Design a protein with these regions (language model features):
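Extreme N-terminal starter segment of soluble prokaryotic enzymes
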Residues: 1-5
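Acidic/glycine-enriched connector segments
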Residues: 8-219
């Protein structure tokens, strides 16, 4: 498959990143993540680097939907954080653990992110809220997945505001007022990711028809 969706998101910590926390909207961040899972689950593979605030959120939404999400999500987790893994990791059967490099956080995260962007073929990357890691992932995504679609959900604030500024210089055609003002995130992601509401959800990607038109719901 060549239409994986990458998610870069976090809720800024006011102690570690007060400036990002000040500009962020935690309610909007949670709503946007929930909406992205709702739109993609059973339709597109969602990939992200494990984050203690985001992974549990994705698990809850997936379980609420009653969809078998084991084949539709791909979670990368650095062994640097092995003693901090959330219990929710156990619910995901497709977790890729990456090397702890010399017990250094920067090198370990770089290793994880390089693997995410070189082992998968993405259609788009979605940036929601976040701190410095969002900027790092944006830069690496552009390097390893050049020319792919990028969606900074500006209304969530945080480091995503910096992603918008970078795109305003390098790819202004990707921007639009809806990134700031459309708070109906389900509608927003259906439109921005070009995923029709008529698309059926499938138990796993292997049985999903390659032709998008063949995935549409049809009356009996």
């Amino acid at each position: 498959m060549n239409d994986f969706i990458f998610l870069s998101a976090s809720v800024p910590d006011p102690k570690r990143a007060p400036a990002y926390a000040e500009s962020s909207n935690s309610v909007a961040i949670a709503s946007a993540v929930r909406a992205l899972v709702h739109v993609t689950l059973g339709r597109r593979v969602l990939v992200w680097g494990g984050h203690p605030a985001i992974t549990p959120m994705i698990k809850v939404v997936a379980e609420e939907m009653g969809v078998d999400y084991s084949k539709w999500v791909k979670l990368y987790q650095s062994l640097y954080f092995e003693d901090q893994f959330p219990e929710d990791n156990d619910a995901f059967h497709n977790v890729i653990y990456t090397e702890n490099i010399n017990n250094e956080i920067g090198k370990s995260l770089l290793c994880m992110r390089k693997r995410m962007f070189t082992e998968n073929n993405f259609k788009a990357a979605v940036f929601i809220g976040g701190m410095g890691g969002v900027i790092d992932e944006f830069n690496l995504f552009q390097k390893y997945q050049s020319g792919k679609y990028i969606i900074p959900v500006v209304s969530t604030g945080g480091a995503t505001l910096e992603v918008e500024k970078k795109l305003n210089v390098s790819a202004p055609d990707l921007l639009g007022n809806d990134l700031c003002y459309d708070l109906d995130y389900v509608r927003f992601f259906h439109r921005r990711l070009d995923i029709s509401v008529r698309e059926e959800r499938y138990p796993n990607p292997d049985i999903q028809p390659k032709n998008v038109q063949d995935r549409y719901w049809k009356p009996n």
